[in-house]
Regions:
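Extracytoplasmic copper-binding redox domains, predominantly the cupredoxin/blue-copper superfamily
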Residues: 25-230
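Bacterial N-terminal signal peptides that target proteins for export
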Residues: 2-13
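Short, low-complexity disordered leader/linker segments with a strong preference
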Residues: 2, 21-28
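Bacterial N-terminal signal peptides
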Residues: 11-22
Length: 230
């Protein structure tokens, strides 16, 4: 028994409808990876002399406003892929540890929360303020292992400080764009970057660099090295 043209047409139509209902296909490994190394010629800053609670904090602390190693590799630089949005809010863990914020720089998406835990057996009085002066919170953390969670609703840079230990500084880079932070070796990596020309922007608390454009290809990695300066 032969198959009519009508039967073939209906079968094809059924397949087309099923594909449409399933939505657009996504290729495994779609998007590329951007890697790089960030350096600076600026010297490391002088250590901080501790004036309160030296038994917990130590006699001195490294000044990580410029966290650079002996070969110029620069840590704590936020690298952002401009226009590449990240949907789900995410929280940022942050510790008070030996009278320093650990990590010093963290990324956070608008609507997420910073979850602060004190590891120190001394009083920390935490402040968080936006660049426009808006105060997000002012909380006391008098005992170790106390965790407090506070939401951050708007994009921008939030500065963290402690009025008890005035040298303490930390930063929350709040953004809904794909971002990463350079490590002690100056290296960063952004995964699942859409194919095409992407502009990278760089934020550091002290140093600067101009934006850089890179061409990303699906399933491939592209490397970019950047030098920051004052």
């Amino acid at each position: 028994m032969g198959i009519s043209r009508k039967t073939v047409y209906l079968a094809a139509l059924t397949c087309a409808v099923a594909i449409a209902m399933a939505g657009p296909s996504v290729r495994a490994g779609a998007g590329g990876t951007v890697t790089g190394t960030i350096t600076t010629k600026e010297p490391a800053m002088k250590p901080i002399s501790v004036t309160i609670d030296p038994g917990v904090c130590g006699q001195s602390l490294p000044n990580e406003a410029i966290a650079v190693d002996g070969t110029g590799h620069l840590a704590n630089v936020v690298v952002t892929a401009t226009g590449v949005k990240v949907q789900a809010p995410a929280d940022a863990p942050l510790n008070n540890e030996k009278c320093s914020f650990v990590p010093r720089v963290a990324t956070l998406r608008p609507g997420g929360s910073v979850k602060m835990t004190s590891k120190d057996p001394v009083l920390h009085t935490m402040h968080a303020a936006a660049a426009d002066g808006k105060a997000y919170f002012n909380v006391s953390m008098p005992i170790p292992n106390l965790t407090i969670s506070k939401p951050i609703d708007k994009p921008g840079v939030v500065t963290l400080s402690c009025s008890t230990h005035t040298w303490m500084r930390g930063y929350l880079f709040v953004t809904d764009e794909l971002s990463g932070i350079s490590g002690r070796d100056g290296k960063f990596q952004l995964d699942n970057v859409p194919a095409g020309v992407v502009e990278l922007r760089f934020w550091h608390e002290t140093l600067k660099a101009a934006p850089v454009k890179v061409t990303v290809k699906d399933g491939q990695s592209v490397n970019v090295d950047v030098v920051l300066a004052k």
